[in-house]
C-alpha cells in the first residue's frame, strides 16, 4: 500500500506578535508542522507495514524553504517528502490548496491519503474533504482509530454519543482527529536518517496546477481588542441571584 500523509506548515504560535493595530506580525515566527498533521503522520506510520511506502506531501510558499522542518517530517516515519512550493500558494485558501494537493497526489500515485482534521492556524477542516471530492474518492472525517484487516480498513469515528465503525476499501481519504494517537518524539537515529531520505521539490507548473479565479480573498487577520473582565461572581442559584444575573446580562447586551 502506498500512503500519502498531507501536512501544512504553520507559524510557531509563541513567535507571533500582536501589533498595536491588532494585526499579527509573523516576521520572526519560525515554521513548524501543524499539530493536527503530526497525528496524521503518526497514523500513517503506525498503519504501514514493512512492505508499504509512506510519502509526506505539503504545498505552500516561503515557509517550505525551512530545512529543519523537512528533516522533522522525515524523522517521523515517511520514506520520502514531496514539496510543491510556489508564490501562488503563499496564502492559498482551502479550495486552491486542495486542488494543488489533488494534482500532486495524482502525479505521485497512492492508495490512501491521510490528513489532519484541520490545520493548526485556521482550522477550517476543509482541505482533506475537498481533495476527496476533487478526486471522487471515499472520504471519512473525524477518524479516531484505524485498523487494517487484509485489504480492508476498519475505521472508528467518535461522534457526540456514539462510536461509528466503518469498513472501507482503498483508494480513500481519511481525516484524523488528535485523539487517534500521541505523535512520537523522533530518536536521534531517526533524525540522522532523515537527512538521507529523498526530498522532491516541485513548482506549480510541475503538477499542471494554476490558481483559479478567486471566489474569496483573505484580506487580513486581526485580533479582537482585549476587554476588561467585570469580576462579578454570583455564587448561588436563588431567585434573587438569577434576577441579578439577568440584569447584568441585559446591561452587557445594551
Functional labels for PLM-detected ranges:
Residues 1-254:
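N-terminal glycine-rich FAD/FM-binding segment characteristic of electron-transfer flavoproteins
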Amino acid at each position: 500500500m502506498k500512503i500519502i500523509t498531507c501536512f501544512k506548515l504553520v507559524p510557531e504560535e509563541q513567535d507571533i506578535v500582536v501589533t498595536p493595530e491588532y494585526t499579527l506580525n509573523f516576521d520572526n515566527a519560525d515554521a513548524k508542522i501543524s499539530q493536527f498533521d503530526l497525528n496524521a503522520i503518526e497514523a500513517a506510520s503506525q498503519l504501514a507495514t514493512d512492505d508499504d511506502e509512506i510519502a509526506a506531501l505539503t504545498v505552500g510558499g516561503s515557509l517550505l524553504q525551512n530545512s529543519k522542518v523537512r528533516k522533522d517530517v522525515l524523522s517521523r516515519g515517511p520514506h520520502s517528502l514531496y514539496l510543491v512550493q510556489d508564490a501562488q500558494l503563499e496564502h492559498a485558501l482551502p479550495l486552491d490548496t486542495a486542488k494543488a494537493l489533488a494534482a500532486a497526489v495524482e502525479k505521485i500515485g497512492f492508495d490512501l491519503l491521510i490528513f489532519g482534521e484541520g490545520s493548526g492556524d485556521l482550522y477550517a477542516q476543509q482541505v482533506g474533504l475537498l481533495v476527496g471530492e476533487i478526486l471522487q474518492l471515499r472520504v471519512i472525517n473525524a477518524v479516531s482509530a484505524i485498523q487494517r484487516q487484509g485489504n480492508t480498513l476498519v475505521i472508528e469515528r467518535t461522534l457526540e454519543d456514539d462510536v461509528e465503525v466503518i469498513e472501507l476499501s482503498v483508494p480513500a481519504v481519511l481525516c484524523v482527529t488528535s485523539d487517534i494517537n500521541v505523535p512520537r518524539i523522533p530518536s536521534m537515529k531517526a533524525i540522522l536518517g532523515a537527512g538521507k531520505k529523498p526530498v522532491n521539490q516541485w513548482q506549480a507548473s510541475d503538477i499542471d496546477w494554476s490558481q483559479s479565479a478567486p471566489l474569496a480573498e483573505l484580506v487580513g487577520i486581526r485580533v479582537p481588542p482585549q476587554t476588561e473582565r467585570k469580576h462579578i461572581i454570583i455564587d448561588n442559584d436563588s431567585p434573587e441571584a438569577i434576577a441579578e444575573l439577568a440584569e447584568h446580562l441585559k446591561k452587557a447586551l445594551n
